[in-house]
Amino acid sequence: MFWFKNVMIYRLTSPLSLESSSLEEQLRQTKFSPCSQSDISKFGWSSPLSGSELLHFSQGKQFLLVSHKEDKLLPTNVIKKETEERIAVLEEKEARKLKKTEKQAIKDDVVAMLLPRAFSKHQFTAIWLDLDAQLVYVDAGSSKRAEDTLALLRKTLGSLPVVPISFALLPSEVMTNWIAKGHTPNWLSLLEEAELKSFDTDSVIRCKRQDLESEEIAQHLQAGKFVTKLAIDWENHFSCVLNEDATLSRVKFADEVREKNDDILKEDIAQRFDADFLLMTEELKLFTQKMIEEFGGIKERI
C-alpha cells in the first residue's frame, strides 16, 4: 500500500466525476513504458496494486493512481569531458572554431552514446482523488513533483482544474498562536521541532529537540517571528510536520493505525490493500476536516 509520507492537497474548482471503466481507458493512453536505449526519460501511469494490470484503484468515489517516472542518470562531468575532447580534436583537425550548433550536435552524439549504458532512477508518486469532497491529495515532497503528476493527469483527462487548498486564516498565524498564546487544539500535541521566520529580515531559526513553550521561543515570537513549520502529533493517528502552506511532510502513521488490518492474511494482497487504503484515506479525511476548522474554513479563490 502506498502509505502517504507527504501530503499536498489541491481543491477542484469545477466538479469532477469519474467512472472506473472510462478512466482506465484514458489511463492506458498514457501508460508508463520503460526507456528504450535512446530515451533519456519516460513518464506515465503504473498500477497502484502489485500484480494487478489495472492502472487505478477505486472505492466508490475514491480513486488512487500512481505515476511512474524513469530518468536515465548521465553524469554531467562525463558528458562535459567527452564533449570537450571531441570538440578539441575536431577544431584542431579543421583549424577553426566550431559553431554553437556544431558543439550542440557533438554533445547530443555523446549523450546518445552514453544512454544505453546509463543507470535508471525510478520515481513513483501516488495521487488520491477524493471526489466526495472534490479534493486531490498528492504524496509529494515538492511542488514540482506534485505539479508534474497533476500535469500528467490533466493530459490524461483532458482537463483538471485544481488549485492548492487555501484557508480563511493563514496557517503560519494560527500555528504561531498555538505556541505564543497556548491555543494548541486539544486533539494534537506539539513536538520539539519548529521553524520560525521573520518576514521583515528573512532571518530563519530552526529548532530541534527544543521546548517550544520555553522563554527563548517566546522571545522570538514577541520579536515578530512567525511559525512556518511545526512538528505535531495527532495521538494514535499520525505525526507530521505541518508547513505554512498547509502541506504535510514526514507523515508517519501510528502503529495503532497500521496494525489495524493485521488480521488479514499477508497472502491476500488485494484485500489488505483495499483495507489499508480505506484506513489511510479516512485518517487523512478526518485530519483535513480538523485543519479546515482550525484555519477558519476553505478560502474560495476567485
Swiss-Prot record:
GO MF annotations in UniProt: double-stranded DNA binding
Pfam families, alphabetized: RdgC
Localization, UniProt: Cytoplasm, Nucleoid
InterPro entries per the UniProt record, alphabetical: RdgC (IPR007476)
GO BP annotations listed: DNA recombination; regulation of DNA recombination
Keywords, in A-Z order: Cytoplasm, DNA recombination
Chief location: cytoplasm
Task performed by this protein: May be involved in recombination.
Alphabetized PANTHER family for the sequence: RECOMBINATION-ASSOCIATED PROTEIN RDGC (PTHR38103:SF1)
Family of the protein in this entry: Belongs to the RdgC family.
HAMAP family: RdgC
Protein name per UniProt: Recombination-associated protein RdgC
Lineage: Bacteria, Pseudomonadati, Pseudomonadota, Gammaproteobacteria, Pasteurellales
Gene: rdgC
